[in-house]
A protein has these predicted regions:
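Interfacial segments of multi-pass membrane proteins
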Residues: 49-54, 75-79, 100, 118-148, ...
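Loop-to-transmembrane alpha-helix initiation sites
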Residues: 135-137, 151-159, 177-187
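Alpha-helical transmembrane segments in multi-pass membrane proteins
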Residues: 6, 10, 14-19, 23, ...
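Helix-coil boundary and interhelical linker segments in multi-pass alpha-helical membrane proteins
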Residues: 1-9, 73-96, 127-134, 168-185
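C-terminal membrane-associated helical module and adjoining short loops/tails
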Residues: 175, 182-220
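C-terminal ends of transmembrane helices
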Residues: 23-26, 102-114, 140-149, 198-203
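Cytosolic, membrane-interface loops and tails of multi-pass inner-membrane proteins
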Residues: 24-57, 115, 203-220
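Short, non-helical or kinked segments that cap or interrupt transmembrane helices
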Residues: 33-44, 110-123, 150-161
Length: 220
């Protein structure tokens, strides 16, 4: 396959896979309801926990993380078929897949382009790309979550820290400049998307009205 065709295939598989929204499927087929009509309106783990409980949240979390992992692994495998003389960073495939999986999750083609915020899908992608960064990101998340009870604040801070950690880690590994740029820009896009999807949460934090972990909302 040509490099252009491989890029298209990676983008398509990641977006379509990301569009398989676990939270929506679990809420519809196990609870005969749509999680997007409750709480924050998002189809993510936190809203599933508030609305349907721990089992629903756990199933959603596992499905969302796996989407990120599988999308990136497929992207990496497909980019392995690039011609030997292709002047393309091998990291382009994994970050393209990661970004499009998050896009698919937040704007799923199968569910009216309204999904979740992509945090766990991004976490799954990071697990497949840079597993060494996950403990650091998890620590950042907990440092924000524990004193405030705000999952959203932890997610936003973690998303902001991810490109910085990626840059530092890429430089420490001695990657070529081309790969450092691809990794850092890819991480910045992923982090920026997650922050953008939390813009309503940011406003609620400013207003002192953000949901706290453990609160349960069954209606808007």
């Amino acid at each position: 396959m040509t490099a252009f065709l491989i890029v298209l295939v990676v983008a398509a598989e990641a977006y379509l896979l990301g569009s398989v929204d676990t939270g929506i499927l679990v809420s519809k087929y196990l609870y005969h309801d749509d999680v997007r009509t409750h709480g924050s309106g998002a189809a993510g783990m936190t809203n599933m926990l508030r609305t349907f409980g721990k089992k629903a949240a756990a199933l959603t979390a596992v499905g969302d993380v796996l989407k990120g992992v599988v999308a990136v692994c497929l992207g990496r495998w497909l980019f392995g078929h690039l011609p030997a003389d292709a002047a393309v960073s091998p990291y382009l495939g994994v970050y393209l897949a990661a970004i499009l999986a998050v896009v698919g999750h937040s704007r799923p083609i199968y569910f009216g382009f309204k999904g979740g915020k992509g945090v766990l899908v991004a976490a799954g992608a990071i697990l497949a790309v840079q597993p060494v960064l996950l403990p650091v990101l998890a620590l950042i998340f907990l440092v924000c979550l524990v004193p405030t009870g705000m999952v959203s604040l932890g997610s936003i801070t973690m998303a902001a820290a991810y490109p910085v950690l990626t840059l530092v880690y890429s430089l420490m590994r001695g990657l070529p400049t081309r790969d450092v740029v691809v990794c850092t820009v890819g991480a910045a896009i992923m982090g920026g998307m997650v922050i953008w999807m939390h813009r309503s949460n940011i406003q609620r934090i400013r207003d002192g009205k953000e949901y706290r972990f453990g609160q349960k909302h069954r209606s808007n």
